[in-house]
Amino acid sequence: MRIMGLDVGSKTVGVAISDPLGFTAQGLEIIPIDEEKGEFGLERLTELVEQYKVDKFVVGLPKNMNNTSGPRVEASQAYGDLLTERYKLPVDYQDERLTTVAAERMLIEQADISRGKRKKVIDKLAAQLILQNYLDRTF
């Protein structure tokens, strides 16, 4: 079963994919989007869904530290609804608190990557962490 993890922002969607057995997550890419123009990167996402034969989506939920939901949670859930409508595949949600912080820390401490390069990979790594946390919790 292939599961696709998504870190949905207002300008990009980080994409990760599980291995066929659902043990590990691998970051794939970052898809540019524009919420204000209604451009959600679905053309590219469709290519990836078909290429990897995706069975399910996991979308990160950026809850506040006190476990309340803010406007980005609603945007992520709306994106999940869009996925369900378009692909007719199940969508689960994974708490993504601090995944971007953890991803940035990994890039600084372990890879010593400059700020400019971090911006180019941070969402992909965050999607990978969201998916890996989901896989660890579920399987």
UniProtKB/Swiss-Prot annotation:
Keywords: Cytoplasm, Hydrolase, Nuclease, Ribosome biogenesis. The keyword Nuclease applies. It is found in: Cytoplasm. One of its GO terms (biological process) is rRNA 5'-end processing. GO terms for cellular component: cytosol. Pfam families: RuvX (PF03652). Belongs to the YqgF nuclease family. Could be a nuclease involved in processing of the 5'-end of pre-16S rRNA. PANTHER family: POLYNUCLEOTIDYL TRANSFERASE, RIBONUCLEASE H-LIKE SUPERFAMILY PROTEIN (PTHR33317:SF4). HAMAP family: Nuclease_YqgF (MF_00651). This is Putative pre-16S rRNA nuclease. The lineage of its organism: Bacteria, Bacillati, Bacillota, Bacilli, Lactobacillales.
